[in-house]
């Protein structure tokens, strides 16, 4: 038999990967090689998902602002342009929150920008 001097290290690494693979279906949570591949893929998906979430929320905010502004008779790009010209520093998240929760304040804001 060949003597293995890194047994503890390998066991720790295997345990770490199998712990990360907990909850995966079938052999994806039982066998090290397959679990390792699935963990790497899951981490990659998680990384991309965190980047994608920022884009999706920004587009959601823009959609909400656009819908609220169209009720007042203008469109999104004109509204944002007039906000910038008048040096009103509200970001899209705040504007979308205003449009959803406090329509009266949002109406006042659109009147200011006209």
Swiss-Prot record:
- Primary role: Binds directly to 23S ribosomal RNA and is necessary for the in vitro assembly process of the 50S ribosomal subunit. It is not involved in the protein synthesizing functions of that subunit.
Looking at the keywords, is Membrane present? no
Q: Which CDD domains does the annotation name? A: Ribosomal_L20
Q: Which family does it belong to?
A: Belongs to the bacterial ribosomal protein bL20 family.
Protein name as annotated: Large ribosomal subunit protein bL20c
Return any one Pfam family short name. Ribosomal_L20
UniProt superkingdom: Eukaryota
Localization annotation: Plastid, Chloroplast
- Respond yes or no to whether keyword rRNA-binding is given for this record: yes
One GO cellular component term of this record is:
chloroplast
Give the matching HAMAP family: Ribosomal_bL20
Enumerate the InterPro entries for this protein.
Ribosomal_bL20, RIBOSOMAL_L20_CS, Ribosomal_protein_bL20_C
Kindly list the GO molecular function terms attached to this UniProt entry.
rRNA binding; structural constituent of ribosome
Q: Which GO terms describe its biological process?
A: ribosomal large subunit assembly; translation
Question: Which keywords describe this protein according to UniProt?
Answer: Chloroplast, Plastid, Ribonucleoprotein, Ribosomal protein, RNA-binding, rRNA-binding
């Amino acid at each position: 038999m060949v003597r293995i001097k890194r047994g503890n290290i390998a066991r720790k690494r295997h345990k770490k990967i199998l712990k990360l693979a907990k909850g995966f279906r079938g052999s994806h949570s039982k066998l090290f090689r397959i679990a390792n591949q699935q963990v790497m893929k899951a981490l990659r998906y998680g990384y991309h998902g965190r980047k994608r979430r920022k884009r999706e929320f920004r587009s959601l905010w823009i959609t909400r602002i656009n819908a609220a502004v169209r009720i007042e008779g203008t469109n999104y790009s004109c509204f944002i342009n007039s906000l910038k010209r008048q040096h009103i520093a509200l970001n899209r998240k705040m504007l979308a929150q205003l449009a959803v929760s406090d329509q009266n304040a949002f109406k006042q804001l659109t009147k200011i920008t006209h």
